[in-house]
Curated annotation (Swiss-Prot):
SUPFAM superfamilies: SMR domain-like. Keywords: Endonuclease, Hydrolase, Nuclease, RNA-binding, rRNA-binding. The gene is smrB. One of its GO terms (biological process) is rescue of stalled ribosome. The keyword Hydrolase applies. One of its GO terms (molecular function) is rRNA binding. It comes from Shigella sonnei (strain Ss046). NCBIfam families: PRK04946.1 (NF003432). Residues 98-173 form the Smr domain. The lineage of its organism: Bacteria, Pseudomonadati, Pseudomonadota, Gammaproteobacteria, Enterobacterales. This is Ribosome rescue factor SmrB. Its EC number is 3.1.-.-.
């Protein structure tokens, strides 16, 4: 089947005349980001120290100064406050979800540590932590723990579609991805 052209023969001839001597551009300057590998099993020998390192930062004695009015939010001093606004509006969609329902405080700390380690390992920028309502123990402690971790850039009460006031959206600092060097 022949392609239909809307140009007249005269216009086509003029176009060919103007394009004489040109060559096709070869696309070789953009290095595409490789697709994320499927999550593979991480050796247990590596997982346990990773979780211990990540949960090491969570202390029950230290009480960071968080704003108690309005929705729960935190922005690390070196991060723009606009990031919290983006979290509030739902501009970031979480790729990993952690449900803390039914866990003890110790288990919740370990799981938070594992979540942060997994985010950094898998280069996941945004995660959702669902602490629930319950007896308000985890609801109160989770923001305090997250504010202590150096890899947590910001967090904000989640929008309704991700759990509302029973969840937090968390921005995790991941290493910069560098494209492979060209030969």
């Amino acid at each position: 089947m022949k392609k239909k052209t809307t140009l007249s023969e005269e216009d086509q001839a003029l176009f060919r005349q103007l394009m004489a001597g040109t060559r096709k551009i070869k696309q070789d300057t953009i290095v595409h980001r490789p697709q994320r590998k499927k999550i593979s099993e991480v050796p247990v020998k590596r997982l346990i120290p990773e979780q211990a390192d990540a949960s090491h930062y969570f202390s029950d004695e230290f009480q960071p100064l968080l704003n108690t009015e309005g929705p729960v939010k935190y922005v690390r001093p070196d991060v723009s406050h606009f990031e919290a606004k983006k979290l509030r509006r739902g501009d970031y969609s979480p790729e990993l979800f952690l449900d803390l329902h039914g866990l003890t405080q110790l288990q919740a700390k370990q799981e938070l540590g594992a979540l942060i380690a997994a985010c950094r390992r898998e280069h996941v920028f945004c995660a959702c932590v669902m602490h629930g309502h319950g007896k308000h123990i985890l609801k109160q402690q989770t923001p305090l723990w997250l504010a202590q971790h150096p890899h947590v850039m910001a967090f904000h009460q989640a929008p309704k579609e991700y759990g509302g006031d029973a969840a937090l959206l968390v921005l995790i600092e991941v290493e910069e991805w560098l494209p492979p060097e060209l030969p």
